[in-house]
Amino acid sequence: MQVDVHIQWDLEDRAIPSSLVENVLKQAHQITAVTWQSWFQHWFEHLQPSISPIQTYELSLLLTDDAAIQNLNATYRHLDRPTDVLAFATLDLTEQPTDLWSEMPVELGDIIISVETAAQQAQEQQHPLPQELAWLATHGLLHLLGWDHPTPERLQDMLAQQQLLINLTNVSAATS
């Protein structure tokens, strides 16, 4: 199983107070591209999605701020407020695989995380920002793979799966 994660940062030009930006960026950048790639690889190996006949996947991870995610949330979900994570799946998982899926990686979609909101939530939960970012990434990943939480029971199932995924990775190593 192979997963390629394309990571983008969109924080540097924003109107976040400079002291907050400096601290948040320092913490967020503790998770290197190699670490993100390793985490997603572990998560995929655990989840064993069977979408791609060649077991090769791609996804994008955008780490941004509240203003950018609020714009996306307003545009696509008609909720004009920031949120912690959005996931935009490329696939309709009810579709039949095409011949192209036998030749190329399956593009799952995009996960967008507000580092600004993640930092606030990490502080409220009293854990490091990298742990919160990993938690939100697992939530977005599960959405890309077809998970949803329309009921309290489904939300609990999803949260339990997120905890399993977090336990597979050494999140604390990213904070040292």
UniProtKB/Swiss-Prot annotation:
Top-level taxon of origin: Bacteria
Subcellular location: Cytoplasm
GO molecular function: metalloendopeptidase activity; RNA endonuclease activity; zinc ion binding
Enzyme Commission number(s) of this protein: 3.1.-.-
Keyword Ligase included in the entry's annotation: no
Swiss-Prot/TrEMBL keywords: Cytoplasm, Endonuclease, Hydrolase, Metal-binding, Nuclease, Ribosome biogenesis, rRNA processing, Zinc
Functional summary from the UniProt entry: Single strand-specific metallo-endoribonuclease involved in late-stage 70S ribosome quality control and in maturation of the 3' terminus of the 16S rRNA.
Protein name: Endoribonuclease YbeY
Organism the protein comes from: Acaryochloris marina (strain MBIC 11017)
Designated gene of the protein: ybeY
